[in-house]
Amino acid sequence: MEEEKILESDLRHISFVMPKYTPIEKIGEGSFSVVYKALDAESGRYVALKAITRTSSPARVLDEMMFLKTLGGRKNCMGLLGCFRNEDQVVAVFPYFEPIDFREFISNANLADIKRYLHNLLIAIEHVHSNGIMHRDLKPGNFLYNKESGRGMLIDFGLAQYEEYSEGQHAEGGAKPAGPLLFFNSVVSKTKPPGYYERDGRPPMKAPRAGTRGFRAPEVLFRCQRQTGAIDMWSVGVIFLTILTTQYPFFYSSDDIDSIVEIATIFGHAEMRKAAKFYGRVWRSNIDSIPEERIPFETIVESLNPWAEIGSDGYDLLYRMLDLCSSSRITASDALSHPFFDDLKTHENCA
């Protein structure tokens, strides 16, 4: 993890916790927070201080703290040691966890490393989902992994929601479209092929759009109103594909339209039409770079990383994670029982 020196100006918004915690260095920064490595004066242990920016919604901050409390720091989910408030400044305190840089990890990860990484991540996701929570922003930066110990920690629940919060029905199973027909016919950011797209003059469908570009599930990009924990499993699949191909980020799109087209260049028109119908949408495109039939993941992985050794079980798990239709996408619980992890579980039982 990249570390930065702390400027005096940075300390103003965490000064009220400094009698108890001594900041050492900045270790992360996002849209709504800055994270510091600090020393707990009482215990002598390192902690992580998450200073939440003033622009954050108070309700969102409260929700994040409640989700952390619910998950209880168990099963590879980051625990909350404490939370301090001074007027509109909030600082959350977490155990310090030393991760490996994700790019460094994928550059030399062997099959056993990949299995341990994914297994740790799935344990966390299964725990989150079993409590009725969707993380909604899964990406390598939000899953800290220590290769030496073989342990991981899921962090940042700032965009999490309970599943029942995202209500309304999308048109699953071939129902009539629930809103305007959307025509995704833009250009892919890397290849820039010729193509067209039709704009619908009606107001766009409103739906949750959490997540980071490149990791958003098809139902998020199709703006389906009802979303489930399946969106997290798509993100896990993208992480899996990223590790196998050693291409980070794997998807480069700058907006949702291009993201859909970029996915289509892999899945092809035939599967995109089926997925669009499943979500009550219509798929139409004339972009030459999109094939009629999908490109197998085996072809993609072997072309980008000829040295990858994953086997049929690994590919089967990848296909089931990156299923365009949310209802048939594998769950975290089922993924943990997948044969891909059989030898890992045998090794753990013998340890």
UniProtKB/Swiss-Prot annotation:
Which residue windows are coiled coil?
A: none
Lineage: superkingdom: Eukaryota
What range(s) does the Protein kinase domain occupy? Answer: 21-341
- What molecular function terms (GO) are annotated for this protein? ATP binding; metal ion binding; protein serine kinase activity; protein serine/threonine kinase activity
Give the catalytic activity: L-seryl-[protein] + ATP = O-phospho-L-seryl-[protein] + ADP + H(+); L-threonyl-[protein] + ATP = O-phospho-L-threonyl-[protein] + ADP + H(+)
Keyword ATP-binding appears in the UniProt entry: yes
Please report the name of this protein according to its UniProt entry: Probable cell division control protein 7 homolog 1
**Which organism's genome codes for this protein?**
Encephalitozoon cuniculi (strain GB-M1)
Name the gene behind this protein: CDC7-1
